[in-house]
Amino acid sequence: LHETTLENLLAHVNEIQDDRAILRSIHFFEETSRVERAAEAIGKADYEEFLKLMDESGRSSWELLQNCYCMKDCHEQKIPLVLALTQLFLNKIGGGICRVHGGGFAGVIAAVVPENEMENYVEYISQYVGRENVYPMDIRAIGAVHIG
């Protein structure tokens, strides 16, 4: 896909016999653009824009990349279920984002929740997934650095 463009893909949609491949390709092109914009947002310390892009990326992973569940067993959709439950919580509090993270089919979700709602979210989501499966994390002001 690095050797073509979204416009070229769209010009040939009717010739491609794999709708899923088209959807996943659209994700690839859009995600590449999002990553560039996210890097710019971080460079400008525009964390609101970064979180917006992270949210868009997560929705695209779910809808277009389709890496939140395994096609072999469509009845088991743990990641989409936890994303939907988390989104209900976030809608209720009026803030935060969630997305699939990591391995996709066998991945986890990442939820960015306002600090003052963290304990409430942990309690809420634990009733569905078990407290042992919820890992609250902090975001450091400085990421990984090389010392020496």
Describe these PLM feature segments.
Residues 103-109:
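N-terminal pre-core extensions flanking Radical SAM catalytic domains
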Residues 1-99, 111-148:
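C-terminal nucleotide
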